Amino acid sequence: MENSLLRPYSIGIVLEDKEGDSDMIKVMPSEQLSMFSGNLNEQKLNYEVNVPDSQGIKRESHVEGGVELVAKWIFSSGNRVTAPNVKKNESVLIYRFADTDEFYWETFMREPSLRRREHVHYAFSNLPNGINSYDKNSSYWFEISTREKHVHLHTSKNDEEPFEYDLRINTREGNLVITDDINDNITIDSKNRIITINHASGNKIEINDNDITMTNVGGSVISMTGGDITINCSNLNFNVSNATITGSNIQLNGGSVTANGEDLNTDLT
């Protein structure tokens, strides 16, 4: 069996912070420089490159360049979509494809003293078959970004799921939102001390600091069931069209009890 044409080339030192979501870095192949001394910026490396011509015959060429290489992320981390946000002076492993000038890189050490803000995206295919590439609408994915200050988890519904869901944490603004695709959502607004539950029907429960508001639209039912229900408050006001209180024993206790109305009917048996 022939050996792979993609093979380890050198341990490298990252020369500049990787830009944004790019897969490319500028790197110095440190193991190739052990014979050099002096200013590295003035050093040159000679590369032997075998490139096929238009007839497929390999021609050997010699290329001279500086100690800086441009390498592409080798994408060896399973479901990770975005390249690691390597910083200047981090260590990476450089690969070279055959005798070409194609170089690739991957991380191989943990260097927490060098790594800073990151943006990481993982995706998991939700396509049942076929040869099409999956995307954000046909995969389950999550994103953690200390650079953009958010965490986002998403499920798609392309494979017969009835609904899709999103969970978003915005650490810059201080809120958490859970939503589905039919307009149900739960929001925790830590900054303003508000917790809100919104139903697709328009019904709503909101806890705003010390105030609790329940909104029922469309004349539906609000039902409370329990062994004992106790309400302790300074004032209790009912504004209703019709009110019915039913029980085997009903007691009204107070310094004074007042009933006002056009008609007051009492049936004591």
Model-derived features: where do they sit?
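Hydrophobic packing positions characteristic
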Residues: M1-G227, N232
